[in-house]
């Protein structure tokens, strides 16, 4: 096609790609709802009927593993394998695919195969992993829909370890691919490797998990390139903790990963070309072309350091710790100018990656030396050094956790390599071991719950508090397990502990009576009763508003024990802001209240209309965390009416701010006070899209639709964690 014709066509593209400012450019502070529409079925080329879990079950996993073993030593001319073995490259691929996980919001991780897309496919820390993905393409192509990229990235890391003599803990399939980039907040910076994410005494902003834009964890040269092992240890401890790793797991992962392979800094990094997303169309997504020598093999430049850690970089060993403790270290520079450390007075017994006649002295990164010079890390490292079996077990377990942390409950794990051991970080819940309540029982239980005298507000608030901890990101939280009765959830301010304790005590009484009297061994869990209490309250509230509705309910939840609950890990699920309950916790917030509302809705898997109808319903039901009247735009609280929308959109009210997140509504004519509100309430009248949804529910003929839509959205949240219902 003629270039002028191409230019003309592009200039007239009706979607305006690359032409003119978008709405977000004109109004950058406008609330964005795009995150609620991510991963819609229409973006999935497999179609809505495709079930990846079922497809994976038909996969010949042994054949895949065999093919991956063969790939490890099938060195390609276009990207030769270090030491004749791709193991180190594929360990890095798997690590970096999984290592974006952050416990603060459960986002990131290996699930979805996001490393195929920007920005991850072009992060500086992922330099040359495009080569690893291209090496895997023939295997992905061979097994097609039965093997997702997401599963393949993790599996190849396991096979790499096994092929080099390490016994892994196990592997679970079941990660379905996503088909568009995740809209995530990776940091405030607009340039790679910048670090505007800190405040105070190097306090890393939430929910971020890396020290600089475009890194997975830490700068291997030290904080901002400062080669200080103790300062590096501080960064390591913070970033690994945000990935849900303790000190022992951290030491095991760093030392285990750096037992293999090498870092590549063979020459001037300025000779490396652009990343995949910035490349020309003819490059076909192949990035970082280097003009240093051949640009590959011994001339490869990936980061900056040029380090080979051990004497056997393609075999599992204890050489990492042996070298770490045996030698003293002096600061040097790589050929690329990166700061690194070299062993003093050490023999040149490290093999070269490509020249069998060449050897090197041991080298380490600043982040490696942190494992020796930080007192807590040193103690663990020395124990691993003296007890190789403990090191191997710790690395196997930490690697499994790293690569499976975002998969959710063990019921999602697929395949013959799933380990049988129950791990506390999987948030285990007992299996159902009794007959479930039937429809007649459920009707009787609803009546008994309402007879306790608990208000609709109390019952709805408790059910919401229990279920709304769910995060579709890492599949943690939710009503199943009834962990709301355990620490730390029972003490969260957002859950109004005194009211929560009252509700739980009443429901436990109902549970005790039913379990003692029900025939046939039937039982009801507290987890089920909490959800059923919300359903009973909603049905009564709808009836009080003149609408008859039945809230769906499916028993089958169980109650987890304190021993099955890692209380420290669950602290990450505490809402610092929950617009559904008009809650704004103390301390620093990185999002405005309305942004936090949309963020929580995205974690719950809600659409814009679902978000809207839930807020409107929860307000009139009086579900505010502190019992305040903010946003309760009704003269009949407790009735499930569409009054929130009717009164919010009424031109009879004018609004004025009284504080940063507080507003007063007055009668337009008389100036008499009418309502109070927060930003989360008023956004449904201010934001054009949310107002459009609100208008639907404010219409004179919308009461029944409002109730039905509220119940549907409510049921979605209550069952968000019910893997058994989705099966």
Curated annotation (Swiss-Prot):
There is a cross-link at residues 95-217 (Tryptophyl-tyrosyl-methioninium (Trp-Tyr) (with M-243)). It is an enzyme of class 1 (oxidoreductase). The keyword Metal-binding applies. Residues 1-21 are annotated as: Disordered. Keywords: Heme, Hydrogen peroxide, Iron, Metal-binding, Oxidoreductase, Peroxidase. One of its GO terms (biological process) is hydrogen peroxide catabolic process. It catalyses: H2O2 + AH2 = A + 2 H2O; 2 H2O2 = O2 + 2 H2O. Its EC number is 1.11.1.21. Binds 1 heme b (iron(II)-protoporphyrin IX) group per dimer. Belongs to the peroxidase family. Peroxidase/catalase subfamily. HAMAP family: Catal_peroxid. This is Catalase-peroxidase. The gene is katG.
């Amino acid at each position: 096609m003629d270039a002028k014709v191409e230019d003309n066509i592009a200039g007239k593209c009706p979607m305006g790609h690359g032409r003119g400012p978008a709405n977000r450019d004109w109004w950058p502070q406008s609330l964005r709802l795009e995150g609620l529409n991510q991963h819609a079925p229409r973006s999935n080329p497999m179609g809505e009927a495709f079930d990846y879990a079922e497809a994976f079950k038909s996969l010949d996993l042994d054949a895949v593993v065999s093919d991956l073993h063969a790939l490890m030593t099938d060195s390609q001319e276009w990207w030769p394998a270090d030491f004749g073995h791709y193991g180190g490259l594929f360990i890095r691929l798997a690590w970096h695919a999984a290592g974006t996980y952050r416990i603060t919001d459960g986002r990131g991780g290996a699930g979805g195969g996001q490393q195929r897309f920007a920005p991850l496919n072009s992060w500086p820390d992922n330099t040359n992993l495009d080569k690893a993905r291209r090496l895997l393409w023939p295997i992905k192509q061979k097994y097609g829909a039965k093997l997702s990229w997401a599963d393949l990235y993790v599996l190849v890391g396991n096979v790499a370890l096994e092929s080099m003599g390490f016994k892994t803990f196990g592997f679970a399939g079941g990660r379905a691919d996503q088909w568009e980039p995740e809209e995530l907040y990776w940091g405030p910076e607009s340039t790679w490797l910048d670090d505007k994410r800190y405040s105070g005494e190097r306090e890393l902003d939430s929910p971020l998990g890396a020290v600089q834009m475009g890194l997975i964890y830490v700068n291997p040269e030290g904080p901002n390139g400062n080669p200080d092992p103790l300062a590096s240890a501080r960064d390591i401890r913070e970033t690994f903790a945000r990935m849900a790793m303790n000190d022992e797991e951290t030491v095991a992962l760093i030392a285990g990963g750096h037992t293999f392979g090498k870092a590549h800094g063979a020459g001037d990094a300025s000779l490396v070309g652009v990343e995949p997303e910035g490349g020309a169309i003819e490059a076909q997504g192949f990035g970082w072309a280097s003009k240093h020598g051949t640009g590959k093999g011994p001339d490869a430049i990936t980061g900056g350091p040029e380090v080979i850690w051990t004497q056997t970089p393609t075999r599992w060993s204890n050489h990492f710790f042996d070298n770490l403790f045996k030698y003293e270290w002096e600061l040097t520079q790589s050929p690329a100018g990166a700061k690194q450390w070299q062993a003093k007075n050490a023999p040149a017994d490290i093999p070269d990656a490509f020249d069998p006649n060449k050897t090197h002295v041991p080298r380490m990164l600043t982040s490696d030396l942190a494992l020796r010079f930080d007192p807590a890390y040193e103690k663990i490292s020395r124990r691993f050094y003296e007890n190789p079996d403990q090191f191997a077990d710790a690395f196997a377990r930490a690697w499994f956790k790293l690569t499976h942390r975002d998969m959710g409950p063990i019921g999602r794990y697929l395949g013959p390599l799933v380990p049988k051991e129950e791990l506390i970080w999987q948030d285990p819940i007992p299996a159902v071991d009794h007959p479930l309540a039937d429809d007649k029982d459920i009707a009787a239980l609803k009546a008994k719950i309402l007879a306790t005298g608990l208000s609709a507000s109390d019952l709805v608030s408790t059910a919401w508090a229990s279920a709304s901890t769910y995060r579709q990101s890492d599949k943690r939280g939710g009503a199943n397990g009834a962990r709301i009765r355990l620490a730390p959830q029972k003490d969260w301010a957002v859950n109004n502990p005194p009211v929560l304790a009252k509700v739980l005590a009443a429901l436990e009484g109902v549970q005790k009576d039913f379990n003692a009297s029900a025939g046939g061994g039937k039982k009801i869990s507290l987890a089920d009763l909490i959800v059923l209490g919300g359903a009973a309250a909603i049905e009564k509230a709808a009836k009080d508003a003149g609408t008859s509705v039945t809230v769906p309910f499916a028993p089958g939840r169980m109650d987890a024990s304190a021993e099955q609950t890692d209380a420290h890990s669950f602290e990450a699920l505490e809402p610092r802001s929950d617009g559904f309950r008009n809650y704004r916790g103390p301390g620093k917030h990185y999002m405005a209240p309305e942004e936090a509302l949309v963020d929580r809705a995205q974690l719950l898997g809600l659409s814009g209309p679902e978000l809207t109808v839930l807020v409107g319903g929860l307000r009139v039901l009086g579900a505010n965390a502190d019992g305040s009247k903010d946003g309760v735009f009704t003269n009949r609280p407790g009735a499930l009416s569409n009054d929130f929308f009717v009164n919010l959109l009424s031109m009879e009210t004018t609004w004025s701010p009284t504080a940063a997140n507080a507003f007063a509504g007055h009668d337009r004519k008389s100036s008499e006070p009418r309502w109070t509100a927060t930003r989360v309430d008023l956004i449904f009248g201010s934001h054009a899209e949310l107002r459009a949804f609100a208008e639907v529910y404010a219409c004179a003929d919308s009461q029944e639709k409002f109730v039905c839509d509220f119940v549907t959205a409510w049921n979605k949240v209550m069952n968000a964690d019910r893997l058994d219902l989705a099966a």
